[in-house]
């Protein structure tokens, strides 16, 4: 059932991709913000409570609902699998950005390519030379592919094998959203509580992304130059704030 769920979700997403900003994402961000606002009181244990509320509670609810549906009617469980995978596997949420930039470069329109990159990543790309432009496009595309596809798929498979259905996909997506949302929205806030929450959410996401990141890099290495990929991992991992990102990018530079 897991295979068909992934296949159906990807097919649906090809024909009806979710926009980058959508109501589901807004609802999840509101849930994370509510958890932080109501449970983060400035101490380490409060940061744990926020993370458990924001990430683990939706994961447990997904597992409970899935198992209830599976015992009642298998098709309903399959529908839940497909629906949640559709919401968490966001291949088309970033692929059109890459395609548009690639097409602009193929036309020789570097100005348009820079504009599209700046729009995609909210960065200043006006003065980027062509080599740097290409590097940024490759890096961001690879990271997006991992976060929207490979990482979600890994945790879906792991927890699905344990009988928890799409709980793994929800787990990875909520952990990623929590780490990014907290860093983006609370970084400038006063109080040590927010800093503690940011540190915890980032640290936990790095840990749960440890294996998927290396599997993603290994997969690219298999179809490329394995020896150069390993050297790239060793060279680039220490240069990034999160080593997982450096490992994936190290493969992209090969």
Give the residues covered by each predicted segment:
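Hydrophobic N-terminal alpha-helices or hydrophobic patches in metabolic proteins across all domains
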Residues: 1-253
């Amino acid at each position: 059932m897991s295979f068909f769920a992934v296949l159906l979700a990807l097919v649906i997403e090809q024909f009806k991709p979710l926009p980058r900003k959508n109501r589901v994402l807004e609802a999840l961000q509101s849930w994370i913000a509510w958890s932080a606002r109501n449970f983060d009181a400035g101490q380490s244990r409060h940061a744990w409570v926020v993370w458990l509320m924001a990430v683990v509670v939706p994961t447990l609810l997904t597992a409970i609902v899935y198992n209830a549906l599976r015992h009642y009617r298998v098709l309903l469980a399959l529908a839940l699998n497909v629906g949640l995978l559709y919401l968490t596997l966001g291949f088309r949420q970033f692929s059109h950005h890459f395609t548009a930039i690639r097409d602009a470069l193929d036309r020789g329109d570097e100005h348009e390519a820079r504009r599209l990159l700046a729009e995609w990543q909210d960065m200043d790309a006006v003065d980027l030379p062509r080599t740097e432009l290409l590097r940024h496009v490759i890096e961001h595309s690879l990271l997006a592919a991992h976060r929207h596809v490979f990482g979600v798929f890994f945790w879906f498979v792991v927890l699905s094998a344990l009988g928890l259905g799409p709980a793994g996909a929800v787990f990875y997506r909520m952990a990623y959203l929590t780490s990014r949302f907290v860093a983006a929205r609370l970084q400038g806030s006063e109080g040590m509580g927010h800093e503690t929450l940011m540190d915890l959410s980032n640290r936990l996401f790095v840990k749960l992304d440890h294996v998927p990141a290396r599997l993603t890099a290994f997969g690219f290495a298999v179809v490329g130059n394995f020896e150069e990929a390993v050297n790239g991992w060793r060279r680039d991992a220490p240069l990034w704030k999160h080593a997982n990102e450096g490992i994936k990018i190290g493969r992209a530079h090969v």
